[in-house]
Amino acid sequence: MARHIKVLIVDDSALVRQTLTDIFSADPELEVVGTASDPFVAVKRMETVVPDVILLDVAMPRMDGLTFLRKIMSQHPIPVVICSAVTEQGAEASFKAMEYGAVEIIQKPKVSTKQFLEESSIRICDAVKAAARAQLRKLAAKRFEVTPKLSADAMLPANAGRSVVQRTEKVVVVGASTGGTEALRVLLEAMPPDCPPIAIVQHMPEHFTAAFAGRLNSTCRIQVKEASDGDVMQRGQALIAPGNLHLLLKRSGSRYYVETKEGPLVRRHRPSVDVLFRSAARYAGNNAVAAIMTGMGDDGAAGMKELHETGAYTIAQDEATCVVYGMPHEAVKLGGVDAVLPLGALAAAIVKACNS
């Protein structure tokens, strides 16, 4: 019998604690072993049972989540998923938490439409499973499919002809998930100011991507911004897909631009790496350079294979530097990867491929 992932929920809202408990109780892989209204109660709970994953609110009375997180990571590291409200302060605190060692960010569940609750449940459960795998690499529980895992066909039909206009301008597409916030910082800070245009999908909740892009923009030599529909791809700039919208690469004449679109979850995600990669295969072909980075699941693997078949240069982050070696591993297994490299070597390899 598959081993349950033990979850401890720490949030000062009784409604949030109950909602999360209900969500996890519906997934056979997850088991709530305790709830706590603040970090002091959480410590008491952990004296009797050690969880595999802690779901942690940031803003709490008596001791805030960031202080508790730092204590956990310094004394007894446990994978932590930050459960944050959608506010500017919440987003900033969440990214601070990622710097302190948290592995995922999720948006607090809220009562809304049936579709929102279903999709929110999928994302929350997947985030906890990914966090557990970041430490428990040998975890072998069979994935519980809540909804069908759609392919990129749901957003962009496969291109039978693959008639890509040949151009000399290169464009870079990148996909990441669990552990990607820190990995993308390392990648983009190493990019030269005149680097080729970059489009990025990082699995992240709605409203958090703008703050994430802003933080990167303040530390990188290139411009980093959340993508808007119709943005033209420019050298020295990286565009990050908005949370809850798919990002597609398009071309008009000699210019690349991006399109942001609503649509179903693809590979259980929106935005989806597969959607971005398929659009790059269609509109850039062998003028694209693609990188797939740390993350759980298989989003991006099929799209990278399509890019590889058009002649694009494809790179996967290696297992040693991934928080979760899921997405890169699936891409390698499909045979769509030209090179497997450590995180610190990705930027130079991308620039070299674009200049060759």
Swiss-Prot record:
Domain (Response regulatory): residue spans on this chain: 6-123
Cellular-component GO terms for this entry: cytoplasm
Modification comment: Phosphorylated by CheA. Phosphorylation of the N-terminal regulatory domain activates the methylesterase activity.
Biological process according to GO: chemotaxis
Residue ranges constituting the CheB-type methylesterase domain according to the UniProt record: 165-356
Enzyme class of the recorded protein, top EC level: hydrolase
Subcellular location per the Swiss-Prot or TrEMBL entry: Cytoplasm
Function text: Involved in chemotaxis. Part of a chemotaxis signal transduction system that modulates chemotaxis in response to various stimuli. Catalyzes the demethylation of specific methylglutamate residues introduced into the chemoreceptors (methyl-accepting chemotaxis proteins or MCP) by CheR. Also mediates the irreversible deamidation of specific glutamine residues to glutamic acid.
Domain comment in the entry: Contains a C-terminal catalytic domain, and an N-terminal region which modulates catalytic activity.
The protein's name in its UniProt record: Protein-glutamate methylesterase/protein-glutamine glutaminase 2
Organism from which the protein derives: Oleidesulfovibrio alaskensis (strain ATCC BAA-1058 / DSM 17464 / G20) (Desulfovibrio alaskensis)
Phylogenetic placement of the source organism: Bacteria, Pseudomonadati, Thermodesulfobacteriota, Desulfovibrionia, Desulfovibrionales
Gene: cheB2
